[in-house]
UniProtKB/Swiss-Prot annotation:
UniProt protein name: Protein ApaG
Domain ApaG: 3-127
Transmembrane parts of this sequence: none
SUPFAM superfamilies: ApaG-like
Organism: Brucella anthropi (strain ATCC 49188 / DSM 6882 / CCUG 24695 / JCM 21032 / LMG 3331 / NBRC 15819 / NCTC 12168 / Alc 37)
Length: 130
């Protein structure tokens, strides 16, 4: 499990390899990841957008931006949490993802919340990022 905390917003990530969706002979490797966003702050926040930087084992970098997550822009009261799952295909056996969410606070102010860097590795090549 990977964790980062920004302004009382904790983001936890649990990546997992999806062997049944991967096709190594076609250089297609697929991972899922489960993210929990916990609002440990004293203000209500809304997740407005996401940004991902995905780097494969060859150093190829892809950037992904978009509104919300999995079609939602959840609002989190203090003490609330939101969990979702998504996935990422690569053409290499490993990679790294890192990113950030743009959140909106009570007064309309926007701020960024870090998504911790996490490694995508097939089980035979497991590594750990701290």
């Amino acid at each position: 499990m990977y964790r980062a905390v920004t302004r009382g917003i904790e983001v936890s990530v649990e990546p997992f390899y999806l062997e049944d969706q991967s096709e190594p002979e076609e250089n297609r490797y697929v991972w899922g990841y489960r993210i929990t966003i916990a609002n440990n702050s004293t203000e209500t926040v809304q997740l407005r957008s996401r940004y991902w930087q995905i780097t494969d084992a060859n150093g190829y970098v892809e950037e992904v931006r978009g509104p919300g997550v999995v079609g939602e822009q959840p609002t989190l009261e203090p003490g609330d949490s939101f969990q979702y799952s998504s996935g990422c295909p690569l053409t290499t056996t490993s990679g790294v993802m890192v990113g950030r969410y743009q959140m909106q606070g009570n007064g309309g102010s926007l701020f960024e919340v870090d998504i911790p860097a996490f490694s995508l590795d097939i089980p035979e090549q497991r590594r750990t990022l701290n």
